[in-house]
């Protein structure tokens, strides 16, 4: 079993939660193709800057219950940089835990092993849709308190 941190925005977090589907862009096809049934996905919501500032959150944990499949139906909201993106490479999910309130990701950074540069931590996530994390980081996250 593998553990994945999946990076999304607030709008697509709502889609993941409601439809129990995770999807990535074409350019991340090779990454999602490593995902197997039974793997755990931790949903990370990016921070929002400006006057509507929100910190980065851990929103929930899901188990993968399907093989990767391609579906170009428009259920996810595209990013402003790529307005035609449909995130077609997808897996179906089963909810393990949704954090209410969500967990502030910044509080976890000092303890997470996969983040080796604690000052420039966002570099470990930039440009990625998802990344594999160690089991001990997964356990730390799911046991965290908001």
UniProtKB/Swiss-Prot annotation:
Family: Belongs to the UPF0310 family.
Gene3D superfamilies the record matches: ph1033 like domains
InterPro entries assigned to the protein according to its UniProt record, in alphabetical order: EVE_domain (IPR002740), PUA-like_sf (IPR015947), UPF0310 (IPR022996)
CDD domains the UniProt entry points to: EVE-like
UniProt xrefs under HAMAP family: UPF0310
Secretion signal span: none
The protein's name in its UniProt record: UPF0310 protein MJ1382
Pfam family, one: EVE
